[in-house]
């Protein structure tokens, strides 16, 4: 670990919307609020109107349990909701329904350990999870320009009541880079279990708590991307170090990350838990976690990035390629299905995780849309053609993969290049045309052979030709030329 980050403690509060829940947490409004006109995806419950009572939705609770299981946490037998009181324009009831164990609440998770892959060292890191809360998201406030300078605020309540996971880690994270990798892995895990789409705008927000040299912790609120989490933490470490070096004392406070200026700014003094007046929500009785809910959640949590990565790596696939596949869910599903159909794992992994993925990226296609990937049968066919020696990998990579990326639904057999049936004739034509290269080879210049092989490959004009076979025929023919010269 870099010495710059010794004596640093970082803890994260990661808020992730369960965008795939199908409904809001306590009403039937859509959990995917994007695309609605302002204040149209609402009802009396999520607007907090008098007399409207909340009713817990089953699906968000199951997804929250699945997330707890996938992140290595303990799941309680009962979930209890509490009220967190504070005033803000985007909070229509003037309280948020959340979970807080010290006020009689029962979170969906208490305690656990998250293992995440460090893709710099290729080691598994660990961070303890303190708790996972299931709560409702507030509405969204829009400012004219900056939050610090705006003259007014506009509020859209379409988001109000959307189910939100608050994942709180212990201060076990040793550096800004580790924080970014942890969040990336966490979001990928939630995508794997079907809880969320991490690429949606505003689907997650991070509050980072950081302290140095055993001093007071500072909270940086509402960071909206993993890149900005890393930047904000780096800035905050430098800011706090400078205060200490000048003989000052870091104050406990809440700060705002200004992404445009690349710096944190003070918002307010840090509140204590008592300031929020937590107490159990009298409108919501405890929710018992039933056996069928646990079974459904366990099924969702059975496949995580960690299990898939290890499975792919165990097939003899290089770790970099294994992670390239794992980190893109449609690619992982495609690869595993292709292997089930009998694809050679190492060849299929290279096709999916390197060349096809790279081609799609270069074309500007969405890597996370399954429709942009070919069916597993195509990968199985191509990998086995290479494994049998019918085609070289390079010919498939250069002549088939670009066409398959452009038209993933194509019959892959129709994309295969025609095989060269008259290699001997091509070799003879090249030898007759490239007299100087032939003489160079006969004079002992071995590099001339590579040139001649290249000329034979060029003469094939895109048809399938194994360069090793061309080389063997050239060597055999050149040896006869030597004999004739004698």
Swiss-Prot record:
Q: Which InterPro entries match?
A: Asn/Gln-tRNA_amidoTrfase_suB/E, Asn/Gln-tRNA_Trfase_suB/E_cat, Asn/Gln_amidotransferase, Asn/Gln_tRNA_amidoTrase-B-like, GatB, GatB_Yqey_C_2, Gln-tRNA_amidoTrfase_suB_CS, Gln_synth/guanido_kin_cat_dom
Per the UniProt entry, the Enzyme Commission number(s) are 6.3.5.-
What is this protein's gene name?
Answer: gatB
One GO biological process term: translation
Q: Which organism is it from?
A: Aeropyrum pernix (strain ATCC 700893 / DSM 11879 / JCM 9820 / NBRC 100138 / K1)
Does the record bear Transmembrane helix in its keywords?
Answer: no
What protein is this chain from? Aspartyl/glutamyl-tRNA(Asn/Gln) amidotransferase subunit B
The similarity annotation says: Belongs to the GatB/GatE family. GatB subfamily.
Quaternary data = Heterotrimer of A, B and C subunits.
Q: Which GO terms describe its molecular function?
A: asparaginyl-tRNA synthase (glutamine-hydrolyzing) activity; ATP binding; glutaminyl-tRNA synthase (glutamine-hydrolyzing) activity
């Amino acid at each position: 670990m870099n010495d710059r980050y010794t004596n640093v403690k970082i803890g994260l509060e990661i808020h992730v919307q369960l965008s795939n829940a199908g409904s809001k947490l306590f009403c039937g409004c859509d959990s995917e609020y994007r695309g609605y006109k302002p204040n149209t995806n609402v009802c009396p419950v999520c607007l907090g109107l008098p007399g409207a009572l909340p009713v817990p939705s089953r699906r968000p609770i199951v997804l929250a349990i699945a997330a707890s299981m996938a992140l290595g946490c303990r799941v309680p037998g009962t979930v209890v909701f509490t009220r967190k009181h504070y005033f803000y324009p985007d909070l229509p009831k003037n309280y948020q329904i959340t979970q807080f164990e010290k006020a009689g609440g029962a979170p969906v998770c208490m305690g656990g350990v998250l293992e995440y892959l460090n893709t710099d060292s290729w080691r598994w890191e660990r961070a303890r999870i303190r708790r996972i809360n299931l709560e409702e998201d507030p509405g969204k406030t829009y400012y004219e320009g900056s939050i610090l300078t705006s003259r007014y605020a506009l509020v859209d309540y379409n988001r109000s009541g959307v189910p939100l996971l608050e994942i709180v880690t212990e201060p076990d994270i040793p550096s800004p880079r580790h924080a970014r990798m942890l969040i990336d892995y966490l979001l990928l895990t939630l995508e794997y279990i079907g809880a969320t789409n991490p690429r949606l705008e505003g689907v997650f927000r991070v509050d980072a708590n950081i302290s140095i040299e055993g001093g007071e912790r500072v909270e940086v609120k509402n960071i909206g991307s993993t890149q900005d989490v890393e930047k904000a933490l780096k800035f905050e470490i430098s800011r706090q170090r400078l205060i200490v070096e000048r003989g000052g004392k870091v104050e406990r406070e809440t700060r705002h990350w200004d992404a445009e200026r690349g710096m944190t700014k003070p918002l307010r003094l840090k509140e204590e838990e008592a300031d929020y007046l937590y107490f159990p929500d009298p409108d919501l009785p405890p929710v018992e976690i039933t056996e069928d809910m646990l079974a459904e959640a366990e099924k969702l949590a059975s496949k995580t990035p960690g299990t898939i990565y290890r499975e792919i790596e165990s097939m003899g696939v290089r770790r970099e390629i294994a992670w390239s596949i794992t980190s893109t869910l449609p690619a992982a599903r495609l690869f595993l299905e292709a292997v089930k159909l009998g694809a050679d794992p190492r060849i299929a992994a290279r096709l999916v995780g390197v060349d096809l993925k790279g081609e799609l990226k270069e074309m500007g296609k969405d890597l996370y849309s399954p429709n942009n990937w070919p069916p597993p049968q195509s990968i199985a066919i191509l990998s086995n053609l290479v494994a049998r020696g019918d085609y070289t990998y390079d010919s498939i990579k250069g002549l088939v993969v670009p066409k398959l990326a452009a038209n993933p639904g194509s019959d892959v057999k129709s994309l295969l290049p025609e095989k060269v049936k008259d290699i001997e004739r091509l070799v003879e034509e090249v030898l007759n045309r490239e007299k100087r290269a032939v003489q160079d080879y006969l004079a002992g210049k071995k590099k001339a052979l590579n040139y001649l092989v290249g000329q034979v490959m060029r003469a094939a004009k895109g048809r399938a030709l194994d360069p090793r076979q061309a080389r063997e025929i050239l060597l055999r023919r050149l040896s006869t030329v030597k004999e004739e010269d004698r």
